[in-house]
């Protein structure tokens, strides 16, 4: 399990986890946080990550990147997002959509793959437009 201790100002500034997301709530939260605050990366492992437990949500929901894409798109609709953060988020959406498209095609979910391909092309066009400006 994961534990996070919040300062009282966190709720006012960033809210809490998005409970409408069936999974990836922590991903969504830290996206919102890191879009507004500087994050320092420590180049030393401080945790031991273990996966594959039967009670993990990744075993319950297929295509976990669907929820990450949703979080990224939600971030992209936030007012005042800096262009550098916006373009980084768009690149990540494109990457996650490519993974989702590949997995959908592998599982013969062609209609879903096509709809994700259209979404990917939309974001690629937005990114090209922003980079041309």
State what each model feature region is.
Residues 9, 28, 46:
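Active-site phosphate/pyrophosphate-handling residues
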Residues 16, 22-29:
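Acidic donor-binding loop at a coil-to-helix junction in glycosyltransferase catalytic cores
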Residues 44-52, 58-83, 111-126:
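Catalytic core of nucleotide-sugar-dependent glycosyltransferases
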Residues 66, 70, 91-103:
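Amphipathic alpha-helical repeat scaffolds of TPR domains
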């Amino acid at each position: 399990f994961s534990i996070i201790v919040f300062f009282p100002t966190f709720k006012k500034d960033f809210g809490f986890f998005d409970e409408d997301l069936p999974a990836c709530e922590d991903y969504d939260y830290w996206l919102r946080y890191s879009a507004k605050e500087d994050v320092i990366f420590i180049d030393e492992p401080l945790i031991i990550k273990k996966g594959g437990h039967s009670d993990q949500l990744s075993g319950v929901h297929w295509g976990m990147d669907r929820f990450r894409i949703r979080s990224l798109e939600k971030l992209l609709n936030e007012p005042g997002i800096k262009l550098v953060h916006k373009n980084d988020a768009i690149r990540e959406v494109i990457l996650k959509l490519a993974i989702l498209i590949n997995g959908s095609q592998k599982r013969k979910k062609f209609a879903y793959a096509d709809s994700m391909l259209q979404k990917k092309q939309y974001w690629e066009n937005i990114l090209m437009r922003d980079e041309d400006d």
